[in-house]
A protein has these predicted regions:
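Active-site gating/metal-coordination segments in enzymes
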Residues: 45, 56-157, 224
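Active-site gating loops and adjacent loop-to-helix segments of metal-dependent hydrolytic enzymes
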Residues: 11-29, 40-41, 74, 178, ...
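Active-site neighborhood of phospho(di)ester-bond hydrolases with catalytic His/Asp-centered motifs
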Residues: 5-8, 47-50, 80-82, 112, ...
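Short, acidic/polar
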Residues: 27-38, 88-103, 204
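An N-terminally biased module of ancient metal coordination in phosphate/nucleic-acid-related enzymes
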Residues: 1-64, 110
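Catalytic pocket-lining loop regions of alpha/beta-barrel enzymes
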Residues: 109-110, 125-251, 259-263
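A short, flexible beta-alpha/helix-coil linker loop
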Residues: 13, 18-20, 52-54, 85-86, ...
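Generic structural signal for well-ordered alpha-helices
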Residues: 31-35, 63-70, 96-100, 125, ...
Length: 269
C-alpha cells in the first residue's frame, strides 16, 4: 500500500473568478476539483498558497480566502499566508511580525509563495525575511528575472544572492522552487538555459547541491515541471539526490488549474 502524499504547493479558489491571462485563460481549482485530483493521485491534502502579487495575472487569492478554504475544507487543505515585501508603505521598516503572528494564530504554517519581482537582498525583502525568522515562519520562494516579463525574487546565475540570505538568516527555513532554482542542480548550467527545463545527465558541481550541503536551512519544493525535471532528467542522479536529501525535500504539485498533469506524483509512486 502506498503512503498518501502531502502536497506542499497548491493554488485554489473558493469559486470561479477572473480568468488568469498568465495561465491560458483558465482559473484555479475549486475545492471539489482539487479533491478529485488528489484522490486520483493518492494525495491526502495540500498546502494552499495565496496568490497576492501584482506580477501574477487575473484572479488574486488573498490570505482571507485561503484561510476560508482551510476552515471549510480541512480534509483537503492546510495553508501558508503570503506577504508582499512592498506592503506597508513600500518600506524596509514595516513590522511584518504583526501580520505574521495574526495569520500564524489562524493556522498558517509559513509564508509563500513569494513572487515579488525584487532582488533577494533588496532591503524590503530582507526585512520580510527577518520577521519570518523571528516568527518561525518558513518561506517558499520563486526565482524570476528582472525587471520585466517575469515574476519571482531575482538572482544571478549560480544564486549568489540566495546564498547571502541563507547565511544572513540561519534559523529561517527556505524552500526553493521554480525553473531558475532547479536548473541549478547541474554544474554545467548556462545563462541561456536558466529559465527552461534542461535535459540530459546532471553534471557534478550543481549549485543547488552545493547550497544544500552547506546550509541546513535550505530545503526544496519539488513541485511543477521544474522539480519533476530535476529529478527525472537523469534517473541515476535523481535517485541519489532523493536519498541524500530525503529529509529536506517536500513533495509538491503546483496545481493551478483543473487540467494540470502531475508526472512526478506517478513517477515517485
Amino acid at each position: 500500500m502506498l503512503v498518501k502524499k502531502i502536497d506542499i504547493h497548491v493554488h485554489s479558489c473558493l469559486k470561479r473568478g477572473t480568468p488568469r491571462f498568465d495561465l491560458d485563460f483558465s482559473d484555479y481549482t475549486t475545492p471539489g476539483e482539487l479533491r478529485r485530483m488528489y484522490d486520483e493521485l493518492g494525495i491526502e491534502k495540500g498546502v494552499q498558497l495565496p496568490e497576492i502579487g501584482v506580477e501574477c495575472g487575473g484572479h488574486f487569492i488573498g490570505n482571507e480566502e485561503s484561510y476560508e478554504l482551510v476552515r471549510t475544507h480541512p480534509e483537503t487543505y492546510d495553508w501558508f499566508c503570503n506577504i508582499d515585501p512592498r506592503w506597508g508603505l513600500n518600506s524596509d521598516q514595516t513590522n511584518f511580525s504583526y501580520l505574521l503572528n495574526y495569520y500564524k494564530n489562524l493556522g498558517a504554517k509559513g509564508v509563500g509563495e513569494i513572487c515579488a519581482n525584487l532582488y533577494f537582498d533588496d532591503p524590503r525583502v530582507m526585512n520580510l525575511f527577518a520577521h519570518c525568522e523571528a516568527c518561525d515562519m518558513p518561506v517558499i520562494f520563486h526565482i524570476g528575472s528582472f525587471p520585466y516579463g517575469d515574476y519571482g525574487l531575482v538572482d544571478e546565475l549560480h544564486l549568489p544572492r540566495l546564498e547571502k540570505v541563507l547565511k544572513t538568516f540561519p534559523k529561517l527555513m527556505f524552500l526553493g522552487h521554480s525553473q531558475k532554482f532547479w536548473a541549478e542542480i547541474s554544474g554545467d548550467l548556462t545563462e541561456e538555459d536558466r529559465d527552461g527545463y534542461p535535459t540530459g545527465p546532471v553534471a557534478p558541481g550543481g549549485r543547488v547541491v552545493e547550497l544544500l550541503r552547506k546550509y541546513p536551512n535550505l530545503c526544496c519544493d519539488l513541485s511543477a515541471g521544474s522539480g519533476e525535471n530535476a529529478i527525472r532528467r537523469d534517473p541515476e542522479f535523481g535517485y541519489a539526490f532523493l536519498e541524500e536529501f530525503q529529509d529536506r525535500l517536500y513533495f509538491g504539485t503546483d496545481i493551478c488549474a483543473p487540467h494540470n498533469e502531475m508526472g512526478l506524483s506517478k513517477y515517485l509512486d
